Amino acid sequence: MTPDQVGELLNVSRETIEKFQAYLTLLEKWQRRINLVSNSTLAEAWQRHILDSGQLAAHYPPQTKHILDVGSGAGFPGLVLAIMGGVTVDLVESDQRKAVFLSTVIRELGLPAKIHNQRIETMPNLRPDVITARALATVPKLLNLIETQLHPDCACLFLKGASVEDELTNLQSYSTMVATTYPSLSGSTGVVLELKNPR
């Protein structure tokens, strides 16, 4: 998938596409030193990483301004959402080397984002509008990890794979949140999982 095709699917400007490219250039440079993503995904980075992450923006609740991205790793989805604009993003990454990479991208691209080099469980409540995560943990474990960040108006947007239905089997036994899944734009087996408190 080409940069222009991804840009069209995400409905972003030429300037945003150029920032995505600058981000991927930094990713490839750092990937030689530290393992940020699977090497096999680099050739398809526009689809596997940029589109996969950026599709979450279409699922923001109204008036979303503040994102908390947990287990940010190489910055997917958090940095992609910061590049797309309209929100500020707090990224949580406990691995120091990955946190340095994230800080470098934020600084060089001038992004509205902040990196927290610590574990999510040790953080004060930041009152985010949306909490995001990709490839971090199962749904029960994720909700346990972010428990101190949740509040009644907070929504969760998680990028999940084919096993998501199994993960949601006993949702009602440990959470009052309501789950909705949407097909992923980036792959046939992936889904966007939305968790919200009932109104």
Predicted regions: what they are:
Residues 1-64, 68, 97-112:
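Class I SAM-dependent transferase core
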Residues 90, 163-199:
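Active-site capping/gating segments
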Residues 136-143:
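Alpha-helical transmembrane segments of helical membrane proteins, especially in multi-pass transport
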Residues 153-164:
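Conserved beta-strand signature within the Rossmann-like core of class I S-adenosyl-L-methionine
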